[in-house]
């Protein structure tokens, strides 16, 4: 069967995705801050490079799939972490294993967002992430922002996720030309540790939106619902290319 790597597979959607892939007989490599097969800090350049290097050592014949799922919410209280992990960590790992995916004509799946509201992000941050890609410059720009202001954190979260969706679209044609599919998944609000940090106001707004799921009247989806989509997109069953 196949060999898949997942960032952030120690809990939440990543853990359910790992579980489902293992049930299907695949080998799964969990990359996480702790309790992973590869334990690194993907918010740091050193951690990202270490993860990529270890994957190249462990999978010399290639990867069937890379699922970039690790991320933090806007309520984490660390603005630099939001930028470095959500955007730069994801892009660096995906680019770092691109050659491994080419060897098997594999697939890359990127978790784009749990919560994106039109207009909630900062276009200047999105443009800097996509068009400049200078992590130090972005971190310097946000260093004077108020990390205790939840709206600031949420705005940066949305910005990183918009930038990821845009990045996926930009690279999709080149990757597809080399036999590698790349897709993005926007899960929405899911029962995870991330959504457990939602403010009372956010929870009230969520309760006012009767979004149907296969579980009926639940306001939040179960992680396994998203895991099924992730596994489908990472598998050979997915014949389309470059979807968000």
Regions found by a protein language model. Give the residues of each.
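N-terminal Rossmann NAD(P)H-binding glycine-rich loop of SDR-like oxidoreductase domains
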Residues: 10, 14-19
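Conserved Rossmann-fold cofactor-binding substructure of NAD(P)-dependent oxidoreductases
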Residues: 43-60
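Hydrophobic structural elements of the Rossmann-like NAD(P)H-binding subdomain
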Residues: 67, 110-112, 182-185, 195
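Catalytic loop of short-chain dehydrogenase/reductase
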Residues: 72-76, 106-177, 189-192
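C-terminal helical subdomain
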Residues: 92, 165, 184, 205-241
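Short, flexible catalytic-loop segment of classical short-chain dehydrogenase/reductase
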Residues: 186-197, 201
